[in-house]
């Protein structure tokens, strides 16, 4: 398959996401952007249906993540996992039996112009209509020495909840997958002496009526 696409036939670590990144980065002058997006969508429907879309749909059904008339903020960081989640949501919406709305939300915590442009270009390439808002979190945690990553993550979550609620959403979706869940458990046991994990869905205690869902909960990274 890869030789037919003009690529070298070598092992792509990371499974679908490795293939997807290679597809995005490969330059093909004159190729229409919507054709690239359709190729990605076709791969989700056929080539990677069992390992991606089936597990995505199973998690949503098994953990009762989506109800009729939900408005979901699909939170996109610009990385491979959140971009994949956005495409899976688009595919789900094509087949779902009840109505729900999607907003593809990108928070700019202080990216450089070049990094922000990469996110915008990749979203356009993959036909994901993103909404971007700014927060300047990077500036806020720049001088903090103790656990800046923890504080940054907390602030990011708060900004996402807040902006999603302003847009009329009742849920935010994050792109954590099965391997992230296992890693969180192991990190807690090894460094914190406690068992802690990521739940597939979580009601917010600070934002009334808001819920966090992780629809990639059953998807393996490899």
Report residues per predicted region.
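Short, acidic/turn-prone active-site loops that include or flank metal/cofactor-
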Residues: 13-17, 192, 200-202
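Conserved, surface-exposed functional patches that form binding/active-site neighborhoods
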Residues: 187, 221-222
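Short, charged, surface-exposed secondary-structure boundary motifs
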Residues: 19-23, 141-142, 206-208
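Rhodanese-like catalytic fold shared by cysteine-dependent sulfurtransferases
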Residues: 1-42
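ATP-dependent adenylation/nucleotidyltransferase module used to activate substrates
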Residues: 32-187, 191-195, 199
